[in-house]
């Protein structure tokens, strides 16, 4: 029969293995190509441009059919991203203010990038896509980067 000390060590080892497995399964891998699509929220460009400046993007599909509007496509992309990566997807989408070439958003005729960035920060909120984030709320904190 196993001693009480051996059983305790086995239980402790089992608990540690479980903790490490859980941590590995929910790791913070939120980079394009790892945890996020290679070009996260590309489908949100049209919605952001429409809402910010009232303009469309040349070459983007135009549809008002339910389930296929720019908003629907954008929200589907956000919904399809894992909950713990949604804010990081928005961060990647808007880019960093210190690097004008980063992010998916671009200056468009009659629609500068800054207003687009400001609008994109609220994509996850109840007034737009209403998706839960890493904070267990439909909000992303600290997007002023």
Swiss-Prot record:
**Compartments where found:** Secreted
Q: Can you list the GO cellular component terms from the UniProt entry?
A: extracellular region
Per the UniProt entry, the signal peptide is 1-25
Primary residence: secreted
InterPro entries xref list: Allergen/soft/tryp_amyl_inhib, Allergen/tryp_amyl_inhib_CS, Bifun_inhib/LTP/seed_sf, Bifunc_inhib/LTP/seed_store
Q: In which tissues is it expressed?
A: Developing endosperm.
Key word Signal present: yes
User: Which keywords does UniProt give here?
Assistant: Alpha-amylase inhibitor, Protease inhibitor, Secreted, Serine protease inhibitor, Signal
Q: Which GO terms describe its molecular function?
A: alpha-amylase inhibitor activity; serine-type endopeptidase inhibitor activity
| Family according to the record | Belongs to the protease inhibitor I6 (cereal trypsin/alpha-amylase inhibitor) family.
User: What name does the UniProt record give this protein?
Assistant: Alpha-amylase/trypsin inhibitor CM2
